[in-house]
């Protein structure tokens, strides 16, 4: 491997250098790179439509998968974080864009309702800071290692999270 072909900091070859299979589009190449890098924790790789892909990642590898997406696969912009409240779990949904590859990935991680904790990705994308605080404030999801995890919209002494389905206001 030449000096210019070295692996990225997380050990994955960048999308432009990742070996492609005949006829494989960039979205499928990203999904394959994630699945190969995190074989036990990344699943459900799907191309939703041209330029939009989706994958699920176990919360234990969320931070590492996000670093891989940014540093090795060129996903430079976290466009949004959202949370979905299901009966027994939360899904945290990340929309992450690669403008160079013209791709958007919807990365989904799940956490049980009785342990709503995932790693913060604010050190990967600075824009995650306020979005994680909003999810904490309104849904009660805790983002480990967040630099300032506190309420952003509601008063600091409020004891509830108003967008949770179990909230009775």
Model-predicted segments: where are they?
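Terminal low-complexity/charged segments
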Residues: 1-169
